């Protein structure tokens, strides 16, 4: 069980992954991570020849394994109009390939529209050193709002199980798959339900074990809205934090440019904010 205590001091490796033309918000997120955790290593796996003097840019094509190529060949979600679903699934395999190619054993990874507010070594929450630490979104979904692996072998095991599951789809089934039926968040939950011992689900609502909370997506959606659809104060009752926000048990707020939540008159720090609206600049810490 996780306890409230400092993690071992590490020079953490942050790994970003993105396919396609780079929106401004990704660059803002990268710059923020450099600012918040200046002693960390930052790797950006992309296909745009991105260059930054303080960030290691890794070309996706240079790290793709044969196993990943087999998954790409199946063209999951081919007929979905939004490339997000294909790219989000592919990202899991690129992440495996980059940590294995570069021999990275410990890393933090989150979606490209996430901001962090605390250096890894200042986080009080005790991450599991043997399991994959990641944010649950709902009873049916696990999301890369924030994830941390301190054990590459464990992470490889999870990705291998995802691969074993996906390889059973025929090429026709994979191409016609719809995101509403299956996506990377639901696949992660499926693997968790089959083998929960591989995962440590991070606290996304206030708990006694920690005065820190991680945002799967819910707090960012409440404070900043969702892309192209809803303004701020959006809640989804299916999200683990969403129902508590909607019922008034949790109140997210911004204080001195840092996100916090109030629960039972106690204030909890948000380690990260998943800004679904992509309005990253609005939430950059001063």
Predicted regions and their residues:
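Short beta-strand-to-loop element that shapes/binds the nucleotide-sugar donor at the catalytic cleft/hinge
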Residues: 131-152
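An acidic- and aromatic-residue-enriched active-site/binding cleft used to recognize and process polar
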Residues: 20-22, 47-49, 109-114, 139
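GT-A fold catalytic core of metal-dependent nucleotide-sugar glycosyltransferases
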Residues: 87-133
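Catalytic core and acceptor-binding pocket of nucleotide-sugar-dependent glycosyltransferases
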Residues: 156-286
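Surface-exposed cleft-lining segments at the edges of enzyme active sites
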Residues: 78-84
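A conditional alpha-helix N-cap/helix-loop micro-motif detector
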Residues: 23, 85-89, 181
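Short catalytic/ligand-binding loop motif for oxyanion handling, primarily in non-cytosolic enzymes
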Residues: 51-53, 116-119, 124, 142-144
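N-terminal anchoring/stem segment of glycosyltransferases
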Residues: 1-77, 100, 152-153, 157, ...
């Amino acid at each position: 069980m996780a306890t409230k205590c400092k993690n071992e001091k590490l020079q953490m490796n942050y790994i970003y992954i993105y396919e396609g033309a780079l929106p401004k918000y990704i660059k803002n997120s990268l710059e923020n991570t450099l600012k918040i955790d200046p002693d960390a290593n930052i790797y950006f796996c992309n296909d745009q020849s991105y260059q930054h003097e303080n960030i290691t840019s890794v070309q996706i094509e240079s790290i793709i394994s044969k196993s990943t190529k087999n998954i790409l060949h199946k063209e999951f979600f081919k007929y979905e109009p939004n490339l997000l679903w294909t790219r989000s699934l592919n990202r899991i395999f690129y992440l495996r390939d980059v940590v294995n190619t570069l021999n990275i054993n410990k890393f933090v990874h989150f979606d490209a529209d996430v901001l962090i507010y605390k250096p890894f070594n200042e986080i009080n929450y005790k991450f599991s050193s043997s399991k994959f630490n990641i944010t649950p979104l709902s009873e049916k979904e696990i999301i890369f709002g924030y994830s941390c692996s301190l054990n590459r072998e464990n992470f490889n095991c999870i990705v291998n199980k995802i691969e074993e599951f996906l390889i059973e789809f025929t090429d026709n089934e994979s191409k016609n798959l719809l995101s509403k039926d299956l996506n990377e968040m639901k696949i992660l939950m499926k693997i968790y339900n089959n083998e929960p011992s591989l995962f440590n689900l991070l606290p996304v609502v206030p708990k006694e074990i920690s005065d820190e909370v991680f945002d799967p997506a819910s707090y960012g959606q409440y404070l900043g809205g969702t892309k192209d659809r809803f303004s701020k104060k959006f809640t989804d009752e299916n999200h683990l934090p969403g129902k508590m926000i909607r019922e008034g048990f949790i109140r997210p707020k911004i204080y001195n440019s840092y996100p916090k939540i109030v629960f039972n008159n106690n204030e909890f720090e948000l380690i990260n904010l998943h800004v679904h609206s992509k309005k990253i600049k609005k939430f950059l810490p001063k």
